[in-house]
Regions:
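Surface-exposed intrinsically disordered loops and tails
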Residues: 124, 128-173, 306-342, 361, ...
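Beta-propeller blade signature
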Residues: 175-183, 224-231, 282-293, 374-383, ...
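Bacterial N-terminal signal peptides
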Residues: 8-20
């Protein structure tokens, strides 16, 4: 539903320019559905209403509501603006993290100015011109160094913006290593955190001052976990063994702890697809929850289910690692799956984050037809409900992870390009509210125009649970009245594909 001009809207409503109040909680005035928007809008310019939201069709839009009236005089408290949860506000940046971090990056935010990344440690590789033999690099001579925020001895490395702490000087064990940063620019290497058999690290979480580092063993099978109380010592933590007994094949799991302390895992489920032909991803994801993150995971309903129709046939595929890496538990590399038609989209390598109760799942997206892979993401107001598709970004097999750091969100991939976002909120939204003080259906006084936006912050003790402060206009200084009107200006201020999509306006009144 598009609105071309103020006059067009006026003719559509052809009559009264005010509404009698409909009650909700404390008689709040809420606009959040297509019917609400159509009923409450007096005029709009450059705006489109679709699926219960309003957004600019071009660079700018202006929306004016009808006067919301009541028989009794009331005092307004605040106006809250809620945007779509689609979260398209991502911009490309060069790879974050250490330049020699290899394989799929795993991120862990411990708190403000305390950010960690895990990955394989890639050695220096000399450049070789075509037709010439590779020449060895000259030995690097480290020097003592100092870096703000680190009170330990440091040494320079041949890699830019990277330093070795004492733990980083210890010999690797064939698995993942740990790097720490205070600013997401300079990185301190603290050495190995997993071993050769545990090299398939998929996710990390922070629990009561300890790092839980999850890995598949063998590859694409049951998640196992280390509990590491000291990420600085260059020694892997305590290997707790298998954490999740995966009833399917697939793993590449992402873990997230909820605010009650329960650990959730989102896992690939290869039962409906030949994953070997779809980048080892699947249209189906599993979800399980545990009270401690170490064991006792109970499976729930799937958070992502994009299966097509089962044919009733069963077929097989082969995995290259299972019997080789864990011959005691896996006697064969052959697995069965249920054939589905038509062709299915595939997702995987899951990573999760929650912002003010809104959950997001990021992962691989392998579309139908063998087109370019990318990062795809889903969202849900509850981790126990099915997630809704949002969008995709980038090129190549991403194996992504997502984290909150330095007041913004980082999306890391194993491709040359990563992404950064200020959050799901998209600028710019300006609002003002007017009041009819004498019941003549005319506005007598307006607030000043004010920009509103959401704000995000850390929650102490949680890595992937982020607090959200609403986009709110304080109306406490507005005089009491019988009618209220909202004016809103929307400006697409970003250089990416996002734009401000307003899903809800809620004007609350004092009791």
């Amino acid at each position: 539903m598009k609105f071309a001009s103020c006059s067009a809207i006026a003719s559509c409503f052809a009559g009264a320019l005010f509404l009698t109040a409909t009650t909700s909680k404390a008689d709040d005035w809420t606009i959040e559905s297509n019917a609400d928007w159509s009923k409450n809008i007096k005029s709009a310019k450059g705006a489109e209403i679709s699926k219960g939201s309003v957004a600019p069709t071009g660079k700018t839009a202006t929306v004016v509501t009808r006067i919301h009236s009541s028989d009794r005089k009331r005092s307004a408290d605040s106006l809250v603006v809620t945007q779509s949860a689609i979260w398209q506000n991502w911009s490309p940046i060069q790879n974050i993290g250490p330049s020699n971090l290899g394989d799929a990056p795993v991120m862990l935010t411990v708190g403000p100015n305390n950010y960690w990344m895990f990955g394989r440690y890639k050695g220096r590789q000399p450049r070789r011109k075509k037709g010439q033999k590779q020449k060895p690099l000259p030995p690097f001579q480290p020097k003592s160094a100092k870096l703000d925020g680190f009170d330990m001895p440091l040494q320079t490395t041949p890699y830019p913006n990277q330093f070795n702490a004492p733990g980083g000087l210890k010999k690797g064990k064939g698995g993942y290593h740990a790097w720490q940063s205070r600013d997401m620019k300079n990185w301190v290497h603290h050495g190995p955190v997993t071993e050769g058999f545990s090299k398939w690290v998929t996710s990390a979480e922070w629990v009561d001052g300890k790092a839980y580092i999850y890995y598949d063993f063998p590859n694409d099978q049951d998640p196992h976990v280390y509990v590491d109380e000291n990420l600085f010592d260059g020694v892997p933590g305590k290997n707790m063994g298998i954490a999740v007994k995966d009833p399917s094949h697939g793993s590449d799991a992402g873990f997230i702890r909820d605010l009650k302390g329960n650990m959730h895992v989102i896992i690939e489920d290869w039962s409906p697809i030949n994953a070997s032909k779809r980048s080892w991803d699947s249209p189906l994801a599993g979800h399980a929850v545990s009270p401690n993150g170490l064991n006792g995971f109970v499976f729930k309903k799937p958070p992502v289910d994009k299966r097509t129709k089962p044919t009733g046939k069963t077929a097989t595929y082969k995995h290259p690692h299972w019997a080789k890496e864990d011959p005691k538990r896996f006697k064969t590399n052959i697995a069965e799956y249920k054939v589905h038609e038509p062709e299915q989209e595939a997702f995987g390598d899951w990573a999760a984050i929650c912002i003010g109760g809104q959950y997001y799942l990021f992962g691989d997206y392998d579309p139908i037809g063998g087109h370019q892979m990318s990062v795809g993401w889903f969202t849900s107001p509850s981790i126990d409900e099915e997630f809704t598709w949002c969008d995709r970004i980038g090129k190549g097999h991403p194996d992504p992870d997502v984290a909150f750091a330095q007041g913004q969100f980082y999306l890391a991939t194993q491709q040359p390009t990563d992404y950064v976002s200020p959050g799901p909120w998209v600028e710019t939204v300006e609002v003002r509210v007017g009041v009819d003080t004498d019941k003549d259906n005319l506005i007598d006084e307006w607030t000043e125009w004010s920009e509103v936006k959401e704000k995000y912050d850390y929650i102490k003790g949680f890595s992937k649970q982020i607090s959200r402060s609403p986009a709110k206009l304080d109306l406490s200084k507005l005089p009491a009245g019988f009618g209220f009107q909202i004016q809103m200006r929307l400006t697409d201020s970003t250089e990416n594909k996002s734009k401000p999509i307003v899903e809800k306006l809620s004007l609350s009144f004092k009791e």
